[in-house]
Amino acid sequence: MRLLIAGGGTGGHLFPGIAVAEEFLSRKKGNEVLFVGTWRGIEARVLPKLGYRLECITAAGIRGKGSVARAKGLAKFLYGYAQSRKILKEFKPDLVLGVGGYASAPALLAARGMHIPRFIHEQNAIPGFTNKMLATVAERVFISLEESRKFFPEERTLLTGNPLRRQILEQVALAPQEERTDDAFHLLVFGGSAGAHRINLIMGEVLPHLEDVKERLRITHQTGENDLEDVTSAYEEQGVAADVVAFIDSMADAYRWADLVVCRAGATTIAEITACGKPCIFIPYPHAVDDHQRRNAEALLKRGAGFVIIEQELSGEVLAKTIRDLMADPARLKSVGEAAQGLARLDAAQVIVDEMMTSKRKEK
């Protein structure tokens, strides 16, 4: 069988698609996967390195833009639609999955016109414009969080969770945390592959408020390239043991090491946090479309599976107090981690592939 996965732009859209691709290829020798994305998206850098085929089309957003920009966006969409039809005719997929992002719309709509079974996956609590529109033409809508169900047709919507790459599933979700005999407290801080400038800055303000517990603290902080030197200097000046890096090669190892995580609330991050059963202080990115990161984090908060500090209320003192309180309450840390793990859907990729294949068999 052949599967075409359309979308990307960000890791939050792309990585669930990669997880589904891994599962689909593992089912039967001879299965094939083709990704469709754009040259501007993260897929253009990531997929070739992983050995996946990628076709790039022209696509752009039109939401919330002026009339001239909308006209240009529409022209790009029509061109991308024509490109998608050509790709579909050449690849001849049995199934098409949209994972969100600009490229998913022309590809899914072209698949509809060619009567190819099509599906979408929504990663966030608040769906993006593209997926809300594509839900009208998709045979199945797969969702990561129960909160997004109300935006889609009930009879065609299935809660699957957010698919995770096998690296995470194998190295973290299935591996026990190392036993430690010392009193060290491991804090993992990160903000995605590019870092998060606000989180990087705030940690410098946090440290003076943790002076009396800094001997216990062991921090791994992923900053991205831009803030690496400044953050490194901040930890050195405060005398706090910290491993400050631009990138973390193995998030699986980092999660396993951590007692507490401080990070943004992107969909993939939340899926990884829950799979690992890690207590986390989420600081949602305030400029995400439809404020979806805050909604993602609140979905865990209301289930006792995480902590949330919105940026408008963020200060060094507030974050330090939250960290200090949790350092002093291992039972609470444990219960929140267990609640997070209770929300994990480790079989998300399997369920999605099963559903797509079942739909294809019914078609026959």
UniProtKB/Swiss-Prot annotation:
Membrane topology: Peripheral membrane protein
Keywords carried by this UniProt record: Cell cycle, Cell division, Cell inner membrane, Cell membrane, Cell shape, Cell wall biogenesis/degradation, Glycosyltransferase, Membrane, Peptidoglycan synthesis, Transferase
Subcellular location: Cell inner membrane
Gene Ontology molecular function: any one: UDP-N-acetyl-D-glucosamine:N-acetylmuramoyl-L-alanyl-D-glutamyl-meso-2,6-diaminopimelyl-D-alanyl-D-alanine-diphosphoundecaprenol 4-beta-N-acetylglucosaminlytransferase activity
Chief localization: membrane
GO CC aspect terms: plasma membrane
GO BP terms in the entry: carbohydrate metabolic process; cell division; cell wall organization; lipid glycosylation; peptidoglycan biosynthetic process; regulation of cell shape
Reactions catalysed, as given in the entry: di-trans,octa-cis-undecaprenyl diphospho-N-acetyl-alpha-D-muramoyl-L-alanyl-D-glutamyl-meso-2,6-diaminopimeloyl-D-alanyl-D-alanine + UDP-N-acetyl-alpha-D-glucosamine = di-trans,octa-cis-undecaprenyl diphospho-[N-acetyl-alpha-D-glucosaminyl-(1->4)]-N-acetyl-alpha-D-muramoyl-L-alanyl-D-glutamyl-meso-2,6-diaminopimeloyl-D-alanyl-D-alanine + UDP + H(+)
CDD domains the UniProt entry points to: GT28_MurG (cd03785)
Entry-linked Gene3D superfamilies: Glycogen Phosphorylase B
Pathway participation: Cell wall biogenesis; peptidoglycan biosynthesis
Stored InterPro entries: GlcNAc_MurG, Glyco_trans_28_C, GlycoTrans_28_N
EC number: 2.4.1.227
Chain sites annotated for binding UDP-N-acetyl-alpha-D-glucosamine: T10, G11, G12, N124, R165, S193, I248, Q293
EC class: transferase
NCBIfam families the record matches: murG
Biological role: Cell wall formation. Catalyzes the transfer of a GlcNAc subunit on undecaprenyl-pyrophosphoryl-MurNAc-pentapeptide (lipid intermediate I) to form undecaprenyl-pyrophosphoryl-MurNAc-(pentapeptide)GlcNAc (lipid intermediate II).
Protein family: Belongs to the glycosyltransferase 28 family. MurG subfamily.
Protein name: UDP-N-acetylglucosamine--N-acetylmuramyl-(pentapeptide) pyrophosphoryl-undecaprenol N-acetylglucosamine transferase
The species this protein was found in: Geobacter metallireducens (strain ATCC 53774 / DSM 7210 / GS-15)
